[in-house]
Amino acid sequence: GISCEACHGPGQQHVDRQISLAAMPDKDRKQALASEPLSIIQPADLDHKRSTQVCGSCHGMKWFDKSENWTEEGFSYRPGDDLSKTTPIIQPSKANEQKWLKPILEKNPEILDDFFWKDGKIRVTGREYNGLLESPCHQLGTMSCVSCHSMHKSNPNDQLAQGMRTNQACLQCHKEMSDDISAHTLHTTNSAGSNCYNCHMPHTSYGLLKAIRSHTIETPDIE
């Protein structure tokens, strides 16, 4: 499980401030709220890359540097930081650029096969950040995890935000397709074949007693 600080960062300063505000007269409290920035991180207010990194710090296939005392001290990443500066994320598509990966592959040439399919897609459950990093929706657009997911106002099953089990998840960006979705899908509107994610986010891994969808979000390719 996770706690508030996993997504919102260290909270002691925030808690102390709220206690202080509660003791203030209304007038002083309003002035303090207007003049002092919040000391807590709100992932939805970050840019789409930093916001996604908050989730990716747990939901990414990362490599642990044994020289760090992470078993005793935890990871140095904190929400709002640049995850790429502290946490190596294994990406087969960038294996040649990830110099730290070379000695690992020399020691175990098949290690990527343990975590990824032959096409580079993640095969381990709960590591959807790896898929999203490869998605044009994230690379070229502004899609983040919170584009579709909500941690507080959702059903715990998949934690999808309201309406995100439908094509609205994709149509919030691809508005030009909303008037005639079947012209794109070639299937009857509201049918399973006309659901965007059934083609662009197929089930590619299994875990948590169910199949998990790919988050690479790409055009289907039979090859």
Label the predicted regions.
Residues 1-223:
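Primarily the internal scaffold of c-type cytochrome electron-transfer domains
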